[in-house]
Every structure is written in C-alpha cells, then in structure tokens.
Amino acid sequence: MQEKPDIPDQVILSCLQTEYGLDCRGVEFLPLGADVNTAVYRAESASGQGYFVKLRRGDFTEITVTLPHFLKSSGIHAIIAPLETSSRRLWAELDSCRVIVYPFIPGRDGYEQALSQAQWREFGRTMKAIHTVALPPALSNAIPRETFPSEWREQVLHFQSLVEEKTFAEPVAAKLAACMQANRQTIHQAVRRAEQLGRLLQTRSRKFVLCHSDIHPGNLHLSPEGAIHIVDWDQPILAPAERDVALIGGCPAWSNPAAANWFFEEYGRAGLDPLALAYYRYERVIWDLAAFCQQILLTDAGGQDREQGYCYFAGNFLPGHEIDLARAVDPFPDS
C-alpha cells in the first residue's frame, strides 16, 4: 500500500501496548508493496527496539502466520516469524484489520539491492529447505493445493473486452485501457498458452511441495550483514516446485544467467519441467494483469497506488520483461 490508511497512529500504539505489551513511542507508515489490503509500519520502543507492524484487512487465514512460525522453528533461518501476543496468539484484532508484528530487521529488498553470489547460493539452499520440509498434518491440511484454475485467465479476457467497449474518464484507468488495447494480441497469446499448459499439467503426475507462491524480488529482504529473509507468506500453496522457482531468471531483476546458475547449483535442476516453468511465468503475468485491472478499472479510489499499479501493469510488456521471459523458457511459445 502506497497511501497511509485512515487509522490514527495512537490507535495502533494502543493496540501494540494492549495486545503485545509493547511500549512504543511512535509508528511510521512505510509505503511498501502493491497489495492495497496491506499497510505496514515501523514501530519503535522507548529502548530503541524496532518492530515491523503489518495491518491486513480483507481475507485472512491463520496459516499465513502459523506456517512461518513453524518454518522458523524447524531451523529455516531465512524466515522472519511473527511475534506472539500476550495471550500467545500470532496476531491481534484492530477494528476490521488483523495486526501482525515482527522484529524489525533493517535492510533492502531484492529490487533495491542486487544479490551477491553468496546470497544467491543461500537463496537456493533456503528454497530447497522449504520445498523439502515435512509438514505436520495440521498445517498441510490447511494449505490449498494447486488446481491450475482458469479464473485469472477468464478475468483478463473479461477486462480485455471491457476496455474495448467502455471509455474511462479517470486518467490512470484510461492509460491502462489504452495499454491493454495496444497489447491485445500479446495478452491473448499469453492467456491461450497458459490455458494449454495448464490443461497439460493437470494430466501429469507431479510431486506437490510447500510453495511460498509469491517469490519475487520484493519479497526477499536483505540485511546489511548479508542475511536473506523470505517475507510475506500470505498465500502458501502445495504445488509443483516450479511455482516458486519460475521467477529465477523469469523477471527482469533476476534475469542474469550467472545469478540463476548460482541459485540452481545449490537448489538443483533435476526434475524441473520447462513446460511447468513456462506455465508459471505466463500465469504470473496473468495474475498481475488481473489484479491491476481490478484495482484500476473497477474503482476510481486508490490515489498514488493507482499510478504505481499502472506502472507495474505496463512493465510486463517491455522488451526483456515478464512476457518475453515467459516466452523464452516456453519450448513452443507460438502454439
């Protein structure tokens, strides 16, 4: 969220005191991320201890906090586990929001700072540990399984029809509509290819592993000491491993072949399916297109988040960006 929500700072401070026993002297809104349902803050105690405070409205499931807590307890050090409340819960309630508190670790994300060779190797080892962890039944039964759904593809085609039929007065919506019209053929090709690959993958017997499902540079936090942390476990899923590793080499910030080699030397390439990698790269584009269409075409609200959303949307079509990188790994991109 790029714009601060209409929640007084004192209300957040009172929640931290009441629910977590934290005597914080202030909170600072951090304009981070593209998720319009999540606001994040930095809180600081009187002793100078920092906390990362997430306010989540809308859908919430316990697995988003219980899973990282389990992974951290299992020895996967790249996970930042949420703190417990005074009543030993992993979140608190604040009006219509859930409040989740983490230790604040200074650093930058993978968009702001390139990973070193050592960090790429640690990233590969960490993802291997996540994909091979043994989940207890209580957790595995609570995590959705991949079904290769057509929902997002259908939404993109719906929005494509909408921009062909409707004129948008709001400037950002008008820009997005024009971008969709200019890239009509590219969008339809990506949707068609994802549909073909999804049907094919449904017929194959594939091992499902625990996947983060939203591995991208913005969800990789790099500390000044060089440690890496995988954050934002809002949508875990049991799926083929390609769901997570598709963006290694599949987004502009991570398209350096040498970096991908460092990652896979630790993670391993055995068993990875090029068709599954292509499917998840196409689907990643389609998920983003649908989400930004919802954000921008269905409402005029959102302020600065709208312009940022448009930039993310349009970036998919730039040379060497997400669409091109999906086609690059697809053995039959024009099928």
What is the predicted role of each segment?
Residues 46-142:
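ATP-binding pocket architecture of kinase catalytic cores
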Residues 39, 44-49, 57-63, 76-78, ...:
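Phosphate/dinucleotide-binding and metal-coordinating scaffold of catalytic cores
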Residues 143, 272-281:
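All-alpha amphipathic helical-bundle segments outside canonical DNA-binding/catalytic cores
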Residues 1-29, 185-186, 192-193, 200, ...:
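Regulatory N- and C-terminal appendages and interdomain linkers associated
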Residues 113-182, 208:
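A cross-family kinase active-site recognition segment
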Residues 241-272, 282-300, 310-316, 320, ...:
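Active-site activation/catalytic loop segments of kinase-like enzymes and analogous catalytic loops
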Residues 36-45, 52-53, 82, 192-245:
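Active-site acidic catalytic loop and adjacent metal/ATP-binding pocket
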Residues 99-113, 161-173, 286-303:
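A glycine-centered beta->alpha junction motif in the catalytic cores
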